[in-house]
Amino acid sequence: MQGSARDFLKPKLVDSVELSTNEYRVVLEPFERGFGHTLGNSLRRTLLSSMFGSAITEVLIDGVMHEFSTIEGVQEDVLDILLNLKEASVGLNASETATVIIEKEGPCQLTVADIEANGTDVSVFNPEKVIATINEGGKIRMTLTIGTG
């Protein structure tokens, strides 16, 4: 680092390229040692905090008292089902919240596509993601609340 604030390197815009409709590459240089990380972290935090999205915010599974339970006739335990639901990529089309009720009887697989089939305001982006495997004679009924934030 230089001696005084007047001697700091002053970065300039070198290049700005539009890679796609949602992606840009901006090159600024030169930076003092460590300043690039500081600026990059600040930009990342600012951009991430200003993004809006939708996610499953509440799950109620019939007959389940807590997340460490198991469901008769379902291969995964409740904790695995919740972790699979956490990976579901969902979006809301109109409202700020939506409630979706899913009922399935086995043998079959419960997938993220079943969320879209039951919720009119909900769209899914990874419909092939498996939430649970329901065995012969097994059934599951869950209520999902999807919210934005």
Segments from the language model and where they lie:
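Protein-protein interaction/assembly regions in multi-subunit complexes
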Residues: 1-149
